[in-house]
Amino acid sequence: MSLKINVRESGNVVILDLIGRITIGEEAASLRDTIKEHLDSGQKNILLNLAEVSYIDSTGLGQFVGSFATVTSRGGQLKLLNLQKKLQELMQITKLITVFETYTNETAAVRSFAGAATAG
């Protein structure tokens, strides 16, 4: 199963609903390209909804880190929503859980961007 990306907006936050697998090849490239398109159009607050991600490999994790660095360097924020149990464990093992803000509630995640915007 390839990666499908549904794009929604909530206020000034772009929510990317990811469905499928994030692996080496087209899937990781598609995620990178989608994030870059939104950054290029001035949308800097990005929330990745991972509720329906069935599998992620090391390339997928690397894509998260690369995207985080790109978004941050352009004055934005990238946050994660609805990590599945296996991904949550993987993020803890790799210590990436300390890099990303993660949420289980979409409303709280979207509101967290508003707090950051007023602080900057």
Whereabouts are the PLM-identified features?
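Exposed loop/turn and edge beta-strand positions of beta-sandwich/beta-sheet ligand-binding modules
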Residues: M1, N12, Q77
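Short acidic-hydrophobic, aromatic-tinged amphipathic segments that line or gate anion-handling sites
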Residues: E101-N105
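STAS-typified acidic loop motif
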Residues: I5-D33
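Amphipathic alpha-helical interaction surfaces in cytosolic regulatory modules
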Residues: I22-F100
